[in-house]
Amino acid sequence: MIVQDTNDNEPKFEKEFYEIDVDESLPKDSQIVPLNARDLDKGKNGRLTYTIIDRDPGVEDYIGVLPSSGIMFLKKQLDREEITSLSMTVRVQDQGLPQLSDTARVKLNIVDVNDNKPVFTAASYSFSVVENIAADSVIGVVTARDGDTGRNGEILYSIKSDSGKFRIDNPSGRTRNTSLSTKNSPQVIVQHWGPEKSGLQGSWPLINLVKF
């Protein structure tokens, strides 16, 4: 007597919902996660195939799944500044008759990396000050922008060189004088540094302080 296996067990994903953080710096063809499923049947009744059946716009361009293993991979590199997350439904199906299947929802959160330098909103600034301006007066404001998010987009300002005559407030970019008089400084050139907290440095605009 030969006992044949009948297709009486559905394939089952380990989880109904997968939420995965994906670093935007991962290169094309990187493996993201294996979507493991089990089927207790034997032979073709337990042979599984994985497909993406429902997806957000853009998923097809970026995400693929290996049919025989369920491993998700990148078709091309992600960019957190363009896409913040991708959601899809993955189906696993056996090869029996009738075919049995299961589905799982997958959400990929794109994690920002520090790939944008801060940029000042102007190449140079000119601020006019009176000769005997009071110490710690606000003489002007500089601003910078950064395309990254979270901590990677937080900007800290510092003064690169000015002989100790000025300081700059964070995170406002307000520039202040530290001494009462500018008598011997008909023109002072100050360079500001705008690095992000995580270390990428921006450009240094010139700031001309003209006494009147």
Indicate residue ranges for each PLM-predicted region.
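Extracellular cadherin-type adhesion modules in metazoan precursor proteins
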Residues: 1-212
